[in-house]
Swiss-Prot record:
Its main location: membrane. This is Fe(3+) ions import ATP-binding protein FbpC. It is a peripheral membrane protein. Keywords: ATP-binding, Cell inner membrane, Cell membrane, Ion transport, Iron, Iron transport, Membrane, Nucleotide-binding, Translocase, Transport. The lineage of its organism: Bacteria, Pseudomonadati, Pseudomonadota, Gammaproteobacteria, Enterobacterales. GO terms for molecular function: ABC-type ferric iron transporter activity; ATP binding; ATP hydrolysis activity. It holds the Pfam family ABC_tran. Transmembrane segments: none annotated.
Amino acid sequence: MSTLELHHIGKSYQSVMVLDRIDLHVPPGSRTAIVGPSGSGKTTLLRIIAGFETPDAGKVILQGKAMFDGTTYVPAHKRGIGFVPQDGALFPHFTVAGNIGYGLKGSQRDKERRINELMDMVALDRRLSALWPHEISGGQQQRVALARALAQRPVLMLLDEPFSALDTALRASTRKAVAELLSEANIASILVTHDQTEALSFADQVAVMRAGKLAHVGPPQELYLRPVDEPTATFLGETLMLTAQLGTGLAHCALGQVKVDNPHRRGEARIMLRPEQITLTPLRPEQYNAASCLAKVVAIDFAGFISTLTLQIISSGETIEIKTISREDLHVGLTVGLDIMGQAHIFAE
């Protein structure tokens, strides 16, 4: 049984369709990331799951029980769902301990014991318990918000872009710590984000949302390497898209012959490669004949660790752009050999 099931969820504001027949299953203990651009409907979907809003159509099922089905509506505070908002939303007039323990019942000793357990769980030094929210770092504030959400022992944790306000290094470490914590506690979770890297690294199930619909749902590696369509492919990372002729498990394209992930397709198709699949080797003239594909570097856009290279394929004159790790041995006018690792992905007809 799934922890959460969404069936044909629909939502409109006046005449604008925000969510269009959303179906999603969240397995027990799993981490799901809903990723999409601003305005795609992902936060509205999260609020419907939490019970802050009601859908116009569909069903919300939590651990086999209807939270909403058109006749049944269970309010947010009775769903047993934890919620961590984007800014943490800590109570400024409560200490760290007061925030974590907000809503806990029982004796003062029981509350203190539970607060200490939660601080240990989210790797917060107990000496911070008497401090005010403004006296601790952004990463610590997010851990306090997570501990507060965990205090009620939720069956599902919802995370609404909780790392977006943190700097890059802190965001990565906090994200990893939260993912490990939720896995250890065997709590199913849903992260909403517009950051593709965050979604791919946090989740074991990624749902790409576009214009109120789920375009593709599946394991992160599947979505990255075999996306359902070109918009999903480009949204999840840098791509090289090529038109090719297919036959006998190969694509004949500007890069020569490339292996593909569907040996049965024939005819013209669009194929996709990720930049890390392409290896560039600087060549001397006497090495040209040994290369499967030759290209000339016509422009380099340096951006630190990554550079964007504009290459002209010598055999066809076609120009392509690829991103690669910046290297001192690459310069304008250089002839390079291109080698492809792995298979190109063929988009569905």
